[in-house]
Amino acid sequence: LGDVYKRQKEIHEQPKAVQDTLNSVIKNGVINLSSVEITEDEIKNFEQIYIVACGSAWHVGMAAQYVLEDMADIHVRVELASEFRYRKMPLNQKALVIVISQSGETADTLAALRLAKEKGITTMAIVNVVGSSIAREADKVFYTLAGPEISVATTKAYSAQLAAMYCLAVQFAKVRSKITDEQYSLSLIHIS
């Protein structure tokens, strides 16, 4: 009974987790990624995005791929962290590697992050735990504000990760001049 209660509690906490995550970067009707420490010049110059994760976070990446490619007109590849680590594939040096991990301690994701950094590729972490290994080692960090997630089945962390990725897609589209000011404003209205 305890696990069911915890899961239900976390399901009901999803709206707050999403709103807190959105409020961390949306100020006065615009997305402000200064806390993530990514510049508009960097956003303009990325040629590709790799999204690397495991489990449910990988599913967030799959959904985000469609939004990023559609809105920001940038090529996106989603990779399981274990595959990213061991496959021999050419990596675009002008890419951004986004790793997603609720805990910030997922072993394969951390190893993939380290590999990307060794290759000289800019990295960004989307994590829920401040001070986690992945957060400390990534070049840029977008914190989700879902709070602790006790239930095995992810709920609020998953939803907050989706919200974070949508914010990135909208801001990349705006900075890369792929959407109009009106489309940008409407996108923010839809998620707020």
What spans do the regions from the language model cover?
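Short, small-residue-biased leader/transition segments that mark boundaries at the very start
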Residues: 1-5, 191
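An acidic-aromatic substrate-binding cleft motif
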Residues: 9-10, 21
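Edge strands and adjacent loops of beta-rich recognition modules
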Residues: 16-26, 30-31
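A short, well-structured juxtamembrane/interface segment
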Residues: 29-44
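Glycine-rich phosphate-binding loops that contact phosphosugars or nucleotide phosphates
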Residues: 44-185, 189
